[in-house]
Amino acid sequence: MGLGAPWNVVVLNDDHNTFQGVAFALSSTLPGVSYEQGMSLANRIHNTGRAIVWSGHKEAAELYWDQLRGHGLTMAPLERV
């Protein structure tokens, strides 16, 4: 792994967030993610228990992780790829 290795932002399934709430949080936080894409990710999170919702530089990953947690999403620790 190089120093610039990407970091994954992972959202976990839970029993308190709605599909719509997850889709809104993802689409309002992550660049380039539409509400429809957020709904698709929400389905993946629900069906598999987790989903990588963004991957990239550590500083941005930390920011998006904090913002998504602020929306009330259940977050896994950042994962270094």
Report the location of each language-model feature.
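Terminal domain-initiation and capping elements
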Residues: 1-81
